[in-house]
Amino acid sequence: EFPENHVDLILNLNTSIGYKKNDLKNLLRNSYTSLKKGGILIIDLMNPAFFYKNFEEQMIFNFKDYEVNQTIKINKIYNSIVSTWDVYKNNEYSKDLSRELKFKLYTTNDIICSSLYYNFTLSNISFYGDMKGNEFHENSPRLIVKITK
């Protein structure tokens, strides 16, 4: 944790939240406490609408002696995803290398509601569709959030 009112900028990049319960709320709470007045929080997320339009339910990746079968299951009601990675080495299933990832996709509504709960002001929340600052819309690949304290 950082001292209160001490930080000018907080970057949360590459969809690094969504894997643990309450991670958005924890990020916002800690950011609000740590940011100076006028400090900025940037959150880089996957745009759920773009993901739903473009994801492939099943993908196979091959490299060297390995094959990875990725299966994605989505729950649009909760904006949650389960991604299963079954790994085979020389055509033998490897339990040690296989994984299941569960994560949540956050919407603009999730961001607004959680931000207001932690005392950020609605007029200080901006959404962008990419890191170049282009307008956010349904077809934007990313959901970039800028929140100023």
Swiss-Prot record:
Keywords: Plasmid
Name this polypeptide is given: Uncharacterized protein in ileS 5'region
Superkingdom classification of source: Bacteria
InterPro entries associated with the record: SAM-dependent_MTases_sf
Cited Gene3D superfamilies: S-adenosyl-L-methionine-dependent methyltransferases (2.20.25.110), Vaccinia Virus protein VP39 (3.40.50.150)
SUPFAM superfamilies: S-adenosyl-L-methionine-dependent methyltransferases
